[in-house]
């Protein structure tokens, strides 16, 4: 059965890096029966830090030592093939997907997750778990081979969702940007995840998790946005 934890963000308000979701990750690993197994960490989204720095930051902040970054393996595909759990950190989604394709890991990760290997990721790591990365919030700093992503969750994900316009900003709101996507891709569904929320995937079912009662938004072309409250589940 497919097992995934897709986190909107690495931080929530002033709680610190991965602090708000640390227990969620612990519970996820225990529930999936891999608490004592090594987690394969994929740091490719972390453009502004080295792979070593990113790995150490995650180990320190999660207070979980059994993490090994994929950049330390001589054969990345084999590392994925042998992984007992897979984690992808946040950063720049364009860079992340570029390297996943460069090392031929997209299909490899898909196959492992379909086979029941637990997957968790935050921000860019949640975005690429969707059908494509086309609802990312990130700068296109490098061009991946394709926008097609891991399709663990077969719809679009927009992490870090914030409603409305920031004071002094005269560009489009997040809702307007996502509406643009739906105008061009009318059969797609978008699930917008506010800060501090997550989707817990079990098979073909998802449950909304959250620090507060911040609902996940389900958006479809020319339809009223549906609010899915924390604790509610849905089939996809």
Across the structure, where does each feature detected by a protein language model lie?
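C-terminal and late-domain segments of enzyme folds
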Residues: 2-34, 46, 51-53, 135, ...
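A glycine-rich, hydrophobic loop/mini-helix early in the fold
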Residues: 41-42, 48-93
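Alpha-helix C-terminal capping/helix-to-coil transition sites in glycosyltransferase folds
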Residues: 81-82, 115, 152
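Catalytic nucleophile loop
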Residues: 87-90, 113-132
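Glycine/threonine-rich flexible loop motifs
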Residues: 93-103, 167
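Catalytic-core regions built around general acid/base machinery
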Residues: 102-116
């Amino acid at each position: 059965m497919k097992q995934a934890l897709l986190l909107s963000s690495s931080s929530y308000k002033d709680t610190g890096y991965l602090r708000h979701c640390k227990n969620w990750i612990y519970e996820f690993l225990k529930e999936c029966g891999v608490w004592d197994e090594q987690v394969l960490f994929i740091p490719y989204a972390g453009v502004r830090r080295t792979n070593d720095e990113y790995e150490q930051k995650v180990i320190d902040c999660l207070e979980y030592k059994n993490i090994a970054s994929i950049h330390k393996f001589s054969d990345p595909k084999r590392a994925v093939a042998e992984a007992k759990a897979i984690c992808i950190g946040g950063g720049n989604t364009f860079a992340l997907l570029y390297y996943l394709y460069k090392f031929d890991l997209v299909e490899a990760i898909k196959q492992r997750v379909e086979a029941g290997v637990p997957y968790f990721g935050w921000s860019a790591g949640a975005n690429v778990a969707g059908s494509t990365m086309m609802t990312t919030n990130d700068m296109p700093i490098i061009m991946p081979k394709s926008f097609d992503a891991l399709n663990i969750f077969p719809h679009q994900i927009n992490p870090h969702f914030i409603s409305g316009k920031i004071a002094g900003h005269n560009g489009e709101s997040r809702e307007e940007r996502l509406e643009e996507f739906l105008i061009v891709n009318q059969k797609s569904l978008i699930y917008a995840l506010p800060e501090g929320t997550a989707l817990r995937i079990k098979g073909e079912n998802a449950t909304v998790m959250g620090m507060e009662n911040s609902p996940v938004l389900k958006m479809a072309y020319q339809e009223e946005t549906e609010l899915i409250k924390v604790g509610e589940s849905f089939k996809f």
